Amino acid sequence: MPYFPDVDRVRYEGPDSDSPLAFRHYDADKLVLGKPMREHLRMAACYWHTFVWPGADMFGVGTFKRPWQGSGDPMELAIGKAEAAFEFFSKLGIDYYSFHDTDVAPEGASLKEYRHNFAHMVDHLERHQQQSGIKLLWGTANCFSNPRFAAGAASNPDPEVFAYAATQVFSAMNATQRLKGSNYVLWGGREGYETLLNTDLKREREQLGRFMRMVVEHKHKIGFKGDLLIEPKPQEPTKHQYDYDSATVFGFLQQYGLENEIKVNIEANHATLAGHSFHHEIATAVSLGIFGSIDANRGDPQNGWDTDQFPNSVEEMTLATYEILKAGGFTNGGFNFDSKVRRQSLDDIDLFHGHVAAMDVLALALERAAAMLQNDKLQHFKDQRYAGWQQPFGQSVLAGEFSLASLAEHAFANELNPQAVSGRQELLEGVVNRFIYA
């Protein structure tokens, strides 16, 4: 029995369509810069917000009445949830999905039950993937929801909790490998602290470093060819999280010699919480050589928490996509919709409305970003702005041919008196707007 009987496969109808169940801009096989849209964007729907979240919040119980979320045998419900998920993915026309281990299988009362349940559901997911052609963008382990992880997983003061988390990550990595996932994500949901009064920062950082090295070792042992991705977030649920932002993650990776092994999965809403723009986080990761993938959503700038709304700003997503295209596009990553409908969006059809609109936003942003790249006025301006560093003097400074003292002598001898030059910010903002609102 279908879970979404009133929805046909969502199709491209063009900009003049007024149907909320049709794409106006996302034409999956349309070529952009010589590559189909679907291959540029590599869009994924997430399991947790779409099929697990019951519509609960801090002040109230769940508002949704999803048929796959009723009472009954947990394994039967998990099987039904998988059937609903792949019906949704197929009708939406999205190519990828993502999950946590405990999204797809009941956790059970012991590790033995966990292993049995998860293995059983991986069998089901594999069959659904083969039948539908839908692929796994990434898998991960939920090492934050169970009360045992209240003080963290890898950073926990109890080594047995560390071992329990390692077991889940071991299992989820193996499942991701079997399901031919493109990436494996490590989100440190509670890897942080509530108060420094009971926290040993150095010890917890060393534990995290040891854990990540074990993950890297296991990746190579099982022959996983995808990327390992840390997902930065500054706070929530903890007061302070150790993977605060892209720059912080890079510093951590360098400390433990992992900067060539692990990249970042950047979430728009997490950038907001860190006081950064989404554009900033992507540009920073690209500049550091650790850009991997994207969690596509948005936060509310007036709220200090993770609202995980669907992306709806073509302007924001154009700048993000421009930065990604300039870096060569996704390798293994993609745009994963870590987004959820609002608590008052009660109907199953709302799941389609949110995803369809967001997919159109990304498609339009891709076209605008491609146009910016083809006539790259921003890069032309940057080349001119930094041109002095390409001249012999600038090159010799960068090459280490001057000491601080000899550089000062050079300035005195040549009576240097450089003048400020306009940064042309307003001009460049106008240039961007002309591409976006063409």
From Swiss-Prot:
Mg(2+) 1 binds at E231, E267, D295, D338. HAMAP family: Xylose_isom_A. PROSITE patterns: XYLOSE_ISOMERASE. Mg(2+) 2 binds at E267, H270, D306, D308. It is found in: Cytoplasm. Belongs to the xylose isomerase family. The active site is at H100, D103. It catalyses: alpha-D-xylose = alpha-D-xylulofuranose. Homotetramer. The keyword Cytoplasm applies. This is Xylose isomerase. It is an enzyme of class 5 (isomerase). Binds 2 magnesium ions per subunit. Gene3D superfamilies: Divalent-metal-dependent TIM barrel enzymes (3.20.20.150). GO terms for cellular component: cytoplasm. Its EC number is 5.3.1.5. Its main location: cytoplasm. Its cofactor is Mg(2+). GO terms for biological process: D-xylose metabolic process.
